[in-house]
């Protein structure tokens, strides 16, 4: 796959003729425009993050099928089938580059791509599923004749024990080494005999997913080797910055400018901090009021958040000045801190209009001693987090639900559950940005406020 700047993409016949559920066994022979390299990857990343959220919410297989179908239509579907397949393949291989770079990234990508493949496979008709099995070149053949007859009674018992009316709709079974289908063995959904599992045609997904995961796991190791030895340095001025940014990309709305739900003033800020700030910003705000100081990381995280919720530059300068001058003089504040505040608002230096930090950036930050920035769900001790959640009014049950997600490293979902517990309403999109939390909170609170009489 060769990335070019902006000319027409040429595609090999092999790519166009790929089945509608590619196996990604080999990289495609095609030229890809630089814009598509990034945009296709972002669209696929939206799908994978949706899958991650669905799994974290413990949705059942049928619900996950529906979710995957919806996510795919929303982010990956194109009117031209061959172009859609190309987008599928390109985006997968781009994200291989993005997520091969550390064990943590590889683990996440491997799990999400495997889950995505599983549910896309489940959505295919049985004939298409068998064709995909053939594409893998698996050596397993259907059990027929006397061997099948001798097993029919026991196969029927296994099937009926899981609610099937007959042993199998198609009466087709595959004889495979039991270690190839660990999930079916663990759930006792297959007949075992002499080291083999007899897998029904309707259970092909388990067999294929094992192969898919094994292949992708090995491929990520090879991709990492190529990335570190050649690609990263060779593409340092072109692809490398895109690849390194994608794994922490925020994919939601732009909160750099305030909107109808984001317009606060100094007189409201203390009350609003208690009613609508997410825990990360509430903690920073309280530490600032308590200590009259925050280190650089905390000032950036809170300052840009306040900018995004509508605090004007003059009010921001007055807010920070009021706190900091309780410990340092006005002259020192103007010299050491005021410039940085104006800089964040695009009034100094390169005049860049800086955007508030998204959850992905906050979670991956590394606060040190004396720092208060970062994500409380990741960086707080369990006792400190429980105390903070208690101050937000969470019940014991709600707190335990949140802590369960924290222990499983689903930090954004933990924040989402906190939001749902505080406001008594669901947040199906999940919390991906502190300013999103604030905006959704304000919508709820303002909807409950009686309209002023005319």
Curated annotation (Swiss-Prot):
One of its GO terms (molecular function) is metal ion binding. One of its GO terms (biological process) is DNA replication, synthesis of primer. [4Fe-4S] cluster binds at residues 280, 359, 375, 415. Keywords: 4Fe-4S, DNA replication, DNA-binding, Iron, Iron-sulfur, Metal-binding, Primosome. Binds 1 [4Fe-4S] cluster. Transmembrane segments: none annotated. Its cofactor is [4Fe-4S] cluster. Pfam families: DNA_primase_lrg. InterPro entries: DNA_primase_lsu_euk, DNA_primase_lsu_euk/arc. GO terms for cellular component: alpha DNA polymerase:primase complex. Belongs to the eukaryotic-type primase large subunit family. Heterodimer of a small subunit and a large subunit. DNA primase is the polymerase that synthesizes small RNA primers for the Okazaki fragments made during discontinuous DNA replication. This is Probable DNA primase large subunit.
């Amino acid at each position: 796959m060769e990335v070019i700047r902006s000319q027409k993409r040429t595609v090999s016949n092999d790519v166009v003729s790929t089945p509608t559920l590619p196996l990604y066994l080999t990289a495609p022979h095609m030229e890809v425009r630089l814009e598509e390299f990034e945009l296709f990857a972002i669209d696929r990343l939206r799908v994978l993050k949706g899958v991650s959220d669905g799994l974290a919410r413990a949705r059942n297989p049928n619900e996950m099928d529906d979710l995957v179908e919806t996510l795919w239509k929303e982010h990956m579907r194109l009117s031209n089938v061959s172009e859609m397949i190309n987008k599928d393949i390109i985006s997968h291989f781009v994200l291989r580059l993005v997520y091969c770079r550390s064990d943590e990234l590889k683990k996440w990508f491997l799990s999400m791509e495997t889950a995505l493949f599983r549910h896309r496979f489940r959505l295919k008709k049985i004939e298409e599923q068998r064709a995909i099995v053939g594409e893998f070149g698996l050596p397993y053949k259907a059990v027929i004749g006397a061997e099948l007859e001798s097993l029919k009674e026991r196969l029927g018992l296994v099937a009926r024990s899981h609610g099937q009316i007959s042993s199998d709709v198609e009466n087709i079974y595959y004889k495979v080494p039991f270690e190839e289908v660990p999930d079916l063995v663990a759930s006792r959904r297959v007949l075992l005999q002499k080291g083999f599992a007899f897998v029904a045609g309707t259970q092909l997904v388990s067999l294929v997913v094992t192969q898919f995961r094994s292949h992708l796991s090995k491929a990520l190791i090879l991709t990492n080797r190529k990335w570190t030895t050649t690609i990263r340095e060779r593409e340092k001025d072109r692809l490398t910055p895109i690849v390194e940014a994608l794994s922490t990309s925020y994919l939601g709305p732009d909160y750099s400018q305030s909107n109808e739900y984001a317009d606060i003033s100094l007189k409201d800020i203390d009350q609003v901090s208690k009613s609508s700030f997410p825990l990360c910003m509430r903690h920073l705000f309280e530490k600032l009021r308590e200590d009259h100081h925050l280190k650089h990381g905390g000032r950036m995280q809170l300052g840009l958040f306040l900018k995004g919720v509508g605090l004007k530059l003059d009010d921001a300068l007055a807010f920070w000045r009021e706190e900091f001058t309780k410990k340092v003089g006005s002259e020192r504040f103007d010299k050491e801190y005021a410039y940085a505040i104006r800089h964040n608002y695009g009034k100094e230096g390169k005049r860049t209009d800086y955007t508030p930090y998204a959850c992905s950036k906050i979670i991956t930050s590394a606060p040190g001693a004396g720092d208060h920035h970062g994500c409380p769900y990741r960086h707080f001790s369990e006792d400190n987090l429980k105390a903070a959640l208690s101050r937000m009014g969470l019940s014991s049950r709600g707190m335990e639900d949140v802590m369960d997600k924290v222990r499983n490293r689903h930090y954004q979902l933990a924040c989402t559950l906190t939001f749902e517990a505080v406001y008594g309403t669901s947040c199906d999109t999940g919390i991906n940005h502190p300013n999103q939390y604030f905006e959704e909170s304000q919508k709820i609170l303002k909807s409950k406020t009686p309209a002023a009489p005319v």
